[in-house]
Amino acid sequence: MRKLMRIDLIFGLLATLTVSPLNAQEGAVAKPPLKIRIDNTANRGIDFLLIRGQNDDGSFSPESGVAVTALCVQAILEHRPKATDSAAIQKALKYIESMIRPDGGIYAEGSYYRNYETSVAVGALVKANDGRYDSQLHRAELFLKEIQWDEGEGIESSDAAYGGQGYGKHKRPDLSNTAFFVEALRNLGNGEDDEAIQKALKFIVRTQNLTGHGNDTEHAGRIGDGGFYYTPAAGGQSQAETTANGGLRSYGSMTYAGLKSMIYAGLSSEDPRVVAAMDFIRNNYSLSDNPGMGQAGLYYYYHTFAKALDAAGAEILDDADGKPHDWRSELTDKLIEQQQQDGSWVNSDNDRWMEGDRQLVTAYALLSLAHCSQ
């Protein structure tokens, strides 16, 4: 009996010695909770912007006008809302204020990107507003609605350009600028039934590769994958080029921009246009590239990806193979992996659309992380 007890004891000790190191190893590689991963990563990015990214006049990458400065301010305040009164943010806000024009727009002198600059500046001023910017924001709203492509530009609702926004100063409307415009109106408190947002919806649905449901363009049925492209105006254009039959190829960043904007305009998850967009997203789920565009616009893609899925209330996405994806966690981990030693992000593989600019790309990454938070 005593011998049996000794054998049992020996096997028990061996089992303990075998299991304990494995358990210890598992504990060592376990990920911190999502919030901690986001906060730690965002703090490094914010430190980069505040320590290395800001100029003496308060701006970030001023060669792009006010846009990058506004995106950086908004990105920082998304993570640190109490930083509004910090010296760095106050300097940046003063720089943005210096770009407020008599027509209500917020843009650099002589800018050809008036809608884009004003729309993103609105996002920053809304985040920092405690009442001090009420008047400026009201005037910015009037400016944005005034330059929307509608009857004021001499076109009817049947025109493919109707309801859209371009960079400004009569530039052809496109989905990217229209998405920034709709987001600005939403930030300003406009509801889904706002007239300008509903006009924008007419343009947005015409950028989708889907027949019917308000899409009467010649390109609507040539691909039919539910994704979105750059613009249907002036004959149409996709940054992902065309198919042999003249179809305008869908790509990732515009599809997420389109989905987000449709949701802001009040379309439900059951609407055929939203369903089709989600089908494209599931069939082209990726964090390694901007589907249809490779590495071009990758961080712009990440930020539209996160904003759209957050707006859609999506938590787990099944891809084309039926594999489930916790997109918030996966995108956070991808951004952790890509963060530079100095805390910044940059698109080292493709600098198209200014993604060689660390301040801009870091702002995109921080905005993405903010929407990964639950």
Regions found by a protein language model. Name each.
Residues 1-5:
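N-terminal secretory signal peptides that target proteins for export/translocation
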Residues 50-56, 316:
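Large, well-folded core regions of big proteins
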Residues 53-54, 97-100:
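A non-catalytic alpha/beta surface segment that caps or lines the substrate-entry region
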Residues 94-95, 360:
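Bulky hydrophobic/aromatic packing residues
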Residues 25-44, 59-88, 102-142, 147-333, ...:
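An alpha-helical repeat/solenoid feature that recognizes helix-turn-helix modules
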Residues 8-20:
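Bacterial N-terminal signal peptides
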